[in-house]
Amino acid sequence: MNELKNDRLLRALLREPVDTTPVWIMRQAGRYLPEYRATRARAGSFMDLCQSPEMACEVTLQPLERFPLDAAILFSDILTIPDAMGLGLYFSEGEGPRFERPVQDAAAIRALGVPDPETELRYVTDAVRLIRRELDGRVPLIGFSGSPWTLATYMVEGGSSKEFARIKGMLYDDPSTLHHLLGVLAEAVTVYLNAQIAAGAQAVMVFDTWGGSLTPEGYREFSLAYMQRIVAGLTREHEGRRVPVTLFTKGGGAWLEVMAETGCDALGLDWTVNIGEARRRVGDRVALQGNLDPAVLYASAERVRAAARKVVEDFGPGSGHVFNLGHGIHPGIDPEKVAALVDEVHKAGMK
């Protein structure tokens, strides 16, 4: 594989010295970019786009052509695993992801198997290999998966949810069945991320989008424990380098200390936590990623720059900070604001 020309991201995730703060953006390949919208229209459907390695590669690289970002992130979806389990993923306008065959009883859950990434999810590993080849060592490639808890919420609810009525009912009434589902998903995520690493992903991230919906006790038992299991099972050295692992729980600011004990290398933060305070709480155990409010990008370029500077300054001196938004970039953002953001982070983060 090609030598990395810019390893800023990997160094920061491992709290090694860097020349400036690295930056990438959740959903950096997305609807705010006109070139993405053109490729998406050409693909036909969102899943057709995800399942074409060539198109997934094309959109993964699009933001790097515009902005001097310090990483590429695989273009895919967190729900590829349940789709490969046979649940029938589809996207409906205005409703987001839905499953034709949700799993809502013990029999359906116990019938689930762990997908083979090189057969059922071959389009993902093929995309990773193609992106690595096209990047030619320019920046590292990040692979990712949803967390077991987050995947389970979609699988049991049948799609997005505000109340989580079905899965919370299962959690309180039939926890053993839910634990079985989470155990299968933890194994599936571990196998899936290891396949991404083998194919060329140089860092990986676990997105726990719905962990913040749990109680403190519920979070430890039904989300964190399974992410810890994944971290323990991941390939941590590949191509002669350490493969950093980042955990991100949206709404998880209260639990940073226990998250830092999982063995991961970095924690993602949403915008409800001050990054300097988070750093004081976790000490030097992990790097931190984040955490600008994505809505700041609706403001003027000057305000975007000021807000970016504040996040960098709040983190303070030294390595261990990867700048990002606190969640995915909104579709209506002007790409020029992103250009201002990236430029300001690199200026403000000079070491």
UniProtKB/Swiss-Prot annotation:
This is Uroporphyrinogen decarboxylase. PANTHER family: METHYLTETRAHYDROFOLATE:HOMOCYSTEINE METHYLTRANSFERASE RELATED, UROPORPHYRINOGEN DECARBOXYLASE. Its EC number is 4.1.1.37. Gene3D superfamilies: 3.20.20.210. InterPro entries: UROD/MetE-like_sf (IPR038071), Uroporphyrinogen_deCO2ase_HemE (IPR006361), Uroporphyrinogen_deCOase (IPR000257). Catalyzes the decarboxylation of four acetate groups of uroporphyrinogen-III to yield coproporphyrinogen-III. It comes from Thioalkalivibrio sulfidiphilus (strain HL-EbGR7). It is an enzyme of class 4 (lyase). It is found in: Cytoplasm. Pathway: Porphyrin-containing compound metabolism; protoporphyrin-IX biosynthesis; coproporphyrinogen-III from 5-aminolevulinate: step 4/4.
